[in-house]
Amino acid sequence: MAETLNPRAGIGMTSARTRGRMVERLREQGIKDEMVLAAMGMVPRHLYVDQALESRAYEDTALPIGFGQTISNPYIVARMAELARHGENGKGQTLGRVLEIGLGCGYQAAVLGKLAREVVSIERIAALVGKTRARLRELRVNNVKPKHGDGMNGARDFAPFDAIVLAAAFAEVPQALLAQLADGGRLVMPLGNATQTLCLIERQGEAFVEQRLEGVKFVPLLPGVA
């Protein structure tokens, strides 16, 4: 498997058994989609965090990844992936092309890559794009395309998308992203500033149906590039 490429992969506490315990915890927390649970079990989270934080990789907590950014906790990654595939109560959808806003360390993109044919991921911080691109290449994650750019603009050249997942919060839904959703597609994002709510928007022709779900806490979505 891909993790054998990295000398950090053989450490006992970062083994497949540890990921299995994480998956069982996700199941207990209410994640039902077996494909999402399988994806979470396959992606080695400890290889997406700094070595100093490796011992905490499978805790259900967000961790810093540098540049003022964080890797989301496993539950929220699984929850957003499940919403991207199902909506709140729907049947699981096979995903073709997915847009992620906020590449970060690449972990969520790698999970989405297990569920979709292709993932395009936008990151505003150039140094983070370079670091994560190298990591994904090392781990042979070949269907994730990291792009440096302003996430507010999405990725028009690759649209339409079956799902759009935002890994950062914004006060309102970026209209440019809604325009890039395929008919029947879903946008999942943390909505708000100080108080944030996980928001699901489904496109039905020219209409958009919005649901506001549980409270969450994400770093803010910033415009421009760095």
From Swiss-Prot:
Signal peptide span: none
A molecular-function term among this protein's GO annotations: protein-L-isoaspartate (D-aspartate) O-methyltransferase activity
One Pfam family from the record: PCMT
Keywords: Cytoplasm, Methyltransferase, S-adenosyl-L-methionine, Transferase
Primary localisation category: cytoplasm
Cell location: Cytoplasm
Group of enzyme by EC: transferase
Entry superkingdom: Bacteria
Active site (catalytic residues): 72
Function: Catalyzes the methyl esterification of L-isoaspartyl residues in peptides and proteins that result from spontaneous decomposition of normal L-aspartyl and L-asparaginyl residues. It plays a role in the repair and/or degradation of damaged proteins.
Family, per entry: Belongs to the methyltransferase superfamily. L-isoaspartyl/D-aspartyl protein methyltransferase family.
Protein name as catalogued: Protein-L-isoaspartate O-methyltransferase
